[in-house]
């Protein structure tokens, strides 16, 4: 088994990127053979997440899908999760919540921490919960695409994740925005209606706005904060 500690010595698998799913199904088939129940998919239920869930369901219908439920998501996001649960009843969708409720966070750090220190808020409500999830597994799946942002352009199918001391599997690295939507329409998949309202990237409601730059899908995230990532994908 390819693990974090054995990364340097282990032989890394290679996958074709010129087939119908640009390698995604091949990567997922390998990942679930390699790790079985020791791999989880941390899903935001954005549009890439919907594609990955559908692909995963074809490989492992009872896979574990973890949603980092910060308590600050849009109602439309929770509606999307409900639709996904209905479409894929065999999937094990886990709503992972932070240790602190919003009221406890307010008492300890002050009101609306996301405005004053968004990095701290993301750490408390996303990074630490994901670290807790990954403590019990060897690898995790992410919907990162190289096209999404400059910080993601060098992502590989299989990555050594130093932040979480884990293996990070990214099946969609070669998919374009058009590829994602073509797949969703072709498969008639449910998706977050906010995507139709100018939100290509969707996170917590207080820190997400419609995209301001048509060439930057994440330009609506943490607008004016000098921040482009929640911290899950930064070493």
UniProtKB/Swiss-Prot annotation:
Disulfide bonds: none annotated. Keywords: Cytoplasm, Iron, Iron-sulfur, Metal-binding, Oxidoreductase. Its EC number is 1.8.4.10. One of its GO terms (biological process) is hydrogen sulfide biosynthetic process. One of its GO terms (cellular component) is cytoplasm. Its cofactor is [4Fe-4S] cluster. GO terms for molecular function: 4 iron, 4 sulfur cluster binding; adenylyl-sulfate reductase (thioredoxin) activity; metal ion binding; phosphoadenylyl-sulfate reductase (thioredoxin) activity. The active site is at 230 (nucleophile). [4Fe-4S] cluster binds at residues 121-122, 204, 207. It comes from the Bacteria. It is found in: Cytoplasm. The keyword Metal-binding applies. Pathway: Sulfur metabolism; hydrogen sulfide biosynthesis; sulfite from sulfate. The keyword NAD does not apply. It catalyses: [thioredoxin]-disulfide + sulfite + AMP + 2 H(+) = adenosine 5'-phosphosulfate + [thioredoxin]-dithiol. Binds 1 [4Fe-4S] cluster per subunit. Pfam families: PAPS_reduct. HAMAP family: CysH. Catalyzes the formation of sulfite from adenosine 5'-phosphosulfate (APS) using thioredoxin as an electron donor. Belongs to the PAPS reductase family. CysH subfamily. This is Adenosine 5'-phosphosulfate reductase. It comes from Geobacillus kaustophilus (strain HTA426). The gene is cysH.
